[in-house]
Structures are given as structure tokens and as C-alpha cells.
A protein has these predicted regions:
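Conserved beta-propeller blade repeats
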Residues: 1-9, 40-59, 87-104, 132
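A flexible loop/linker signature enriched in serine peptidases of the S9 family
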Residues: 2, 9-19, 38-42, 60-67, ...
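Structural beta-strand/beta-sheet cores of well-ordered domains, especially the beta-sheet scaffolds
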Residues: 4, 18, 31-33, 45, ...
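Multi-bladed beta-propeller domains
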Residues: 11, 23-43, 74-91, 118-132
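Beta-rich carbohydrate-recognition and catalytic domains
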Residues: 69-72
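Rossmann-like AdoMet/SAM-dependent catalytic core
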Residues: 84, 93-97, 106, 113-115, ...
Length: 132
């Protein structure tokens, strides 16, 4: 992870986080780079570091729908990549650990399930913990 930068969200006029920026420590805020912007006024955004500290995840969500993007912490010019396109009523959250990506979702699982895959580009998800 590059300790010269940090990421933050910026609030819109309704005090909702809708944009993610990257700031270089010691530089002017005027030079901050817009990394992600949520276009829907119903959705808010946040950014987090994966458990294995290899990826940043940008999550955008409303009350019952979510969508997530990712990029590697080593990327010099971060370009968030979509994990799974938003689908109304489907909530999901992806994290990475031990060489796998884990997805906690209610997609076809009212009480949620956890799936995993080893590659987000191919996304061959397998059930890790089934819904009850």
C-alpha cells in the first residue's frame, strides 16, 4: 500500500457521500483525483480496504440494493472495476482473504449465503456457506 495517498468520500448538497477521491499527502486538495462518482441520488458510496490489504472496495448502495467495485492497492492510477452489476433488491459485499474472494449476498438466498471464487475477472462463484 502506498502511504503517500489516502482515499476519502465527499458529501453532496444533501450530505450524502457520492464521490471518492484520492489525496496525495502534502499536496493541495485542489489536485485531488476523482476515483469514483455515484450518479444515482438514491445511492451512497464508501471505500474500504480488504481483509488481506490487497484491494480497495468501493461500495455503492441504497436500502435494499448494492454494487461494488475494486482495484488493487498497488495500482498507480486506480480504475475501479465492477464486480457484479446492481440488481434491484440484491445486496452483496465482497472481501478477499487467503487467495479467495468471498461474497456475502442475498441473491437467491433470503437469509444470505457466502460464495467464493479465486478470480474476479472470471467469477466462477461456488457456494462456501449455503443459506439456511
Amino acid at each position: 500500500m502506498d502511504d503517500q495517498y489516502f482515499f476519502y468520500s465527499k458529501l453532496d448538497e444533501f450530505h450524502r457521500p457520492r464521490k471518492i477521491f484520492r489525496h496525495k499527502i502534502g499536496s493541495s486538495v485542489k489536485n485531488d483525483e476523482l476515483i469514483f462518482e455515484e450518479k444515482s441520488e438514491a445511492f451512497t458510496v464508501g471505500i474500504s480496504l480488504s481483509s488481506d490489504e490487497k484491494y480497495f472496495f468501493i461500495t455503492t448502495s441504497d436500502h435494499n440494493t448494492s454494487e461494488q467495485y475494486y482495484f488493487e492497492v498497488t495500482e498507480k492510477n486506480p480504475k475501479p472495476k465492477l464486480i457484479i452489476k446492481r440488481n434491484k433488491g440484491v445486496i452483496y459485499s465482497v472481501n478477499s482473504w487467503g487467495g479467495y474472494f468471498y461474497c456475502h449476498t442475498n441473491d437467491d438466498a433470503e437469509d444470505f449465503k457466502i460464495e467464493r471464487c479465486d478470480d474476479l475477472l472470471n467469477q466462477k462463484w461456488e457456494i462456501y456457506i449455503a443459506a439456511k
